[in-house]
């Protein structure tokens, strides 16, 4: 059995987990930074300072709760990209320092791979499988062929889907993060009232574009006085628009996989936006694949997914040198 201590500091969550190859989570400590909610978004310098302040305490707490010592660990893992460079430096340097002192291997984890693989901690999802990663920083389709081996089928050409949710929410006068509030208000709205643009729909390929939807919502806000019902109707119409785009792109992704002679049975939807229950139900109803969603606490950033990915990589003997430099941009294809 292998056991890993993992660190996640790529954005505004400071998290530490201890995970083993028997699929047990021995400890998980996470601290979300409420400061960003008051400011309407993540401030990189504030985020990195908070990581510096809290990370060592979370590591100490996780080790104590696991009833292990550093000598009991088989490796130390950290999210080393992509993400905000300040946070990545804090987490990666701390993990490398522990690895050096404890004489343990260091594993640099790609944040995107961690989102893609965490489902295998919970379910018997076999390679190859299709991944739709929809989060605050990323929106892309991947075929996961194996640990460390991916084919990117498409991605956003402008904003990520999470950014689109947050920016639309801000236009409507809602607080950050916008996704949960849009989903809540949409339940009281009429999704057929406003016809928002479905960019790139019915076109070949798996790329996305969400800038036109934002512009359309901005125009609605300027045209209407935006009563409470108007806001609910815009939220519902926005979600209907997003679901139509995702369904169209998923159909194309399946066709593209077939053209590559890759048989896909399992489809994993992951990332923070995958916690949206409306989108989950739409995809379940219309996609003829085995669909898997991580639980909500594993859709958003966490250290459990980093620890599990560390286990998967350790089992392949994928070890990284202590001079590995954090990467704010890190394509999963080249992993």
From Swiss-Prot:
SUPFAM superfamilies: Actin-like ATPase domain. GO terms for cellular component: cytoplasm. Belongs to the KAE1 / TsaD family. Its main location: cytoplasm. Keywords: Acyltransferase, Cytoplasm, Iron, Metal-binding, Transferase, tRNA processing. Fe cation binds at residues 111, 115, 301. The keyword Iron applies. It catalyses: L-threonylcarbamoyladenylate + adenosine(37) in tRNA = N(6)-L-threonylcarbamoyladenosine(37) in tRNA + AMP + H(+). The keyword Magnesium does not apply. Required for the formation of a threonylcarbamoyl group on adenosine at position 37 (t(6)A37) in tRNAs that read codons beginning with adenine. Is involved in the transfer of the threonylcarbamoyl moiety of threonylcarbamoyl-AMP (TC-AMP) to the N6 group of A37, together with TsaE and TsaB. TsaD likely plays a direct catalytic role in this reaction. GO terms for molecular function: iron ion binding; N(6)-L-threonylcarbamoyladenine synthase activity. Binds 1 Fe(2+) ion per subunit. This is tRNA N6-adenosine threonylcarbamoyltransferase. Gene3D superfamilies: 3.30.420.40. Substrate binds at residues 133-137, 166, 179, 276. GO terms for biological process: tRNA threonylcarbamoyladenosine modification. It is found in: Cytoplasm. Its cofactor is Fe(2+). Its EC number is 2.3.1.234.
